[in-house]
Amino acid sequence: MESSSDPQIIAIAGLPPPDTNLTANTAASDRAAIITVLILALIAIALRFTARNIQQTKIHWDDWVIIISMALVGGTAGLAIAGGHYGAGKHIWAVDLDSLQQIYKILFGYTFLYSASCAVIKISILLFYSRIFLSTERLFALSMKFGYFLSISYPIVVWVTMGNVCRPLDHFWTQFAGTKGTCIDINTFFLALGIINMINDFYILLIPIPHIFRLQMSLRKRIGIAGILMLGGFVCAASAVRIHFLTELSKTKDVTRAMGPVFIWSDLEPCIAIVSACLPHLAPLRHIVRDKISSTFGSQDDEVELTNRITGGSAAGHAASTQSSSAENIHRQGIHVHTSYTQQTDQR
């Protein structure tokens, strides 16, 4: 076993445990998982734009931004697959020094794209919030501004830190060859970033909830709308799993083996985020399916009804109009809220 391992790798990681299978390699399954979630994200975006076409509504900024995020996630997926080619998913004793250095070069670039993709997805979601919730409340405005701050500052912190992660910078991947230099505690840094990103996910997920529960509709229907938006909770779950694997990476010398699941979940997390960001826009497609089922089985329409009585010139009418405006915006963006107005005009 000793003779089959690169002596320079043994100098770094020590001898492999006696029961280690040096032929084990998860690269193929890792690649399949990454491609699968990437395709799901692409399908979600395609359905989102199909729904736009059905509604005959214009493409908004949040739609364009989600496309940018998809391009970034595609870049991270390509790097993750390249990492598997060089040995991510194998035991460290089954790779040579050159391959290990290539993996760390990939990891360096991957970090920049991953942090950017997370930020862009969050910005797309915030742009969506700003369109459907036409609120002038100070608390909501501050919540949105803080959400933008968290989203934009995250990649900036990552980029600045990674730009100074080692002195000299190439020591990040040449350190295994015994070059002279210093680096920060990289694994702890990655773990901290994972936790911060998950906290940001939770925060952005919760921003619209108070506003939704002030809409003029039944509690059951408000819970339904909140539930659609809260599907983003799957992203938080994916973040938690990713943090687990980052923790495992920080504890082991078998870093290449541990990088396999880290790469998977670092791609799965933003892909789930893209799917979750697209789900609220897909109601027109659901309604087409529902209408076909209704015509076949005679089921009743269960769309959310919101009725406002607007009395000309009254303060109450103005407040009702503001609430209904938010609800109608939700309908246009895919969460189907049907708004009917009754205009009463005094006959003179």
Question: Residue ranges of each PLM-predicted region?
Answer:
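First transmembrane helix
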Residues: 29-55, 116-123
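Extracellular TM2-ECL1-early TM3 structural module of rhodopsin-like
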Residues: 75-118, 183-192
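Helix-to-loop junction signature of class
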Residues: 75-92, 157-178, 196-212, 234-262, ...
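Flexible, low-complexity linker/tail segments at the boundary of structured domains
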Residues: 249-272, 279-348
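Juxtamembrane membrane-interface segments at transmembrane-helix boundaries in membrane proteins
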Residues: 16-31, 97-106, 180-186
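Extracellular N-terminal segment of 7TM GPCRs
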Residues: 1-43
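Extracellular loop 3-seventh transmembrane helix
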Residues: 34, 107-118, 181-200, 222-290
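Interfacial segments of alpha-helical transmembrane regions
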Residues: 61-71, 121-158, 220-231
